[in-house]
């Protein structure tokens, strides 16, 4: 994470008069990113409320969705706070810089947690498709909760080490920071991303094959998973590249600034997209304006095949959270 210290603007940044076009693009993209963050926080807050406070029964996948919504909300909140500090008036620069650095570290924590949760979702569903009998009979009862807790702990540990060795306010150790940075980025780009891509590809092939053989639509749950992963890889991957590659590549400040802006907007879009995916996939054309949001969300996350010509029940089944 050492590479991220210089990859984005910070409070007190001054842009020279010769960068008028870059400045205009920067503020335009920043405005879009902030608007996306606000909408995404509202959507993820709704998902969190429906799954935790609305009395909805939760399946193992619902547990992952709840944790993912929390990670996305935290990421969007930190992103919006950072953008506000960059573009708003700075009354006390030192305090603003410390708040900015804190928000940035929490943002990395949320990003890592969200990435690892999506990887766990894809891996678990891939195993359920490849080994359905083993998965049904031998999966630990509280696997989803245990895995989610372990991934949050791993994300916290990784970002704590990065903060301890790399944050400028804590007298960073450049040598140790470099090692932590390599391990951190290797874990993200060398393990989580490849596993997510591999398992989601296998899942897509098997789901597509089964749908063609049985001549029926794939489960809504699989559509939700594959769409969410596709959006994440398309929109959030630029942020990971921004963290890792820009440190090794010598590029102009204008290019670095613009790429940082675009990667922020795309990652904000990714964290805001999941609630939209849930409600689009879970809605039924004949009752699109008549159903409650809880019913739509429950149908999207239901881990059962949908009978042909019949409406699918809308509650998440509680099969061992």
UniProtKB/Swiss-Prot annotation:
Recorded topology in the membrane: Multi-pass membrane protein
Q: Which GO terms describe its cellular component?
A: plasma membrane
A molecular-function term among this protein's GO annotations: G protein-coupled peptide receptor activity
Q: In which tissues is it expressed?
A: Expressed in a subset of sensory neurons that includes nociceptors. Expressed in the subclass of non-peptidergic sensory neurons that are IB4(+) and VR1(-).
Where are the annotated segments for Disordered? 302-321
Q: Where in the cell is it found?
A: Cell membrane
InterPro entries given in the database record? GPCR_Rhodpsn, GPCR_Rhodpsn_7TM, MRGPCRD, MRGPCRFAMILY
Coiled-coil-forming residues are none
Q: Where is the composition biased (Polar residues)?
A: 312-321
Residue ranges annotated as Cytoplasmic topological domain: 30, 94-146, 203-220, 282-321
Task: Name the job this protein performs.
Answer: May regulate nociceptor function and/or development, including the sensation or modulation of pain. Functions as a specific membrane receptor for beta-alanine. The receptor couples with G-protein G(q) and G(i).
Question: Which protein family is named in the record?
Answer: Belongs to the G-protein coupled receptor 1 family. Mas subfamily.
Recorded protein name is Mas-related G-protein coupled receptor member D
UniProt organism field:
Mus musculus
């Amino acid at each position: 994470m050492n590479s991220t210290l210089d990859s984005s603007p910070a409070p007190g940044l001054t842009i020279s008069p010769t960068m008028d076009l870059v400045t205009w693009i920067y503020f335009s993209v920043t405005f879009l990113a902030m608007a996306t963050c606000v909408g995404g926080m509202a959507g993820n807050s709704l998902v969190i409320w429906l799954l935790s406070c609305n009395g909805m029964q939760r399946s193992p996948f619902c547990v992952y969705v709840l944790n993912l919504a929390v990670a996305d909300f935290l990421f969007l909140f930190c992103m919006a706070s950072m953008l506000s500090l960059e573009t708003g008036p700075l009354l006390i620069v030192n305090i603003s810089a410390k708040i900015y650095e804190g928000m940035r570290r929490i943002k990395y924590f949320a990003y890592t947690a969200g990435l690892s949760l999506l990887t766990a979702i894809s891996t678990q569903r891939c195993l359920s498709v490849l080994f359905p009998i083993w998965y049904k009979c031998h999966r630990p009862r509280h696997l989803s909760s245990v895995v989610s807790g372990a991934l949050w702990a791993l994300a916290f540990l990784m970002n704590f080490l990065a903060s301890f060795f790399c944050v400028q306010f804590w007298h960073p150790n450049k040598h140790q920071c470099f090692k932590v940075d390599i391990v951190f980025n290797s874990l993200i780009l060398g393990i989580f991303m490849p596993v997510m891509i591999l398992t989601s590809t296998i899942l897509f092939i098997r789901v597509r094959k089964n749908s063609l053989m049985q001549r029926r639509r794939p489960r809504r749950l699989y559509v939700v998973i594959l769409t969410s992963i596709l959006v994440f890889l398309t929109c959030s991957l630029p942020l990971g590249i921004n963290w890792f590659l820009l440190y090794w590549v010598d590029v102009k400040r204008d290019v670095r600034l613009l790429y940082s802006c675009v990667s922020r907007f795309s990652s904000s879009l990714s964290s805001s997209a999941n609630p939209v995916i849930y409600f689009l996939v879970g809605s039924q054309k004949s009752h699109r304006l008549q159903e409650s949001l809880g019913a739509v969300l429950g149908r999207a996350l239901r881990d059962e095949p949908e009978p042909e010509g019949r409406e699918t029940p809308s509650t998440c089944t509680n099969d061992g959270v």
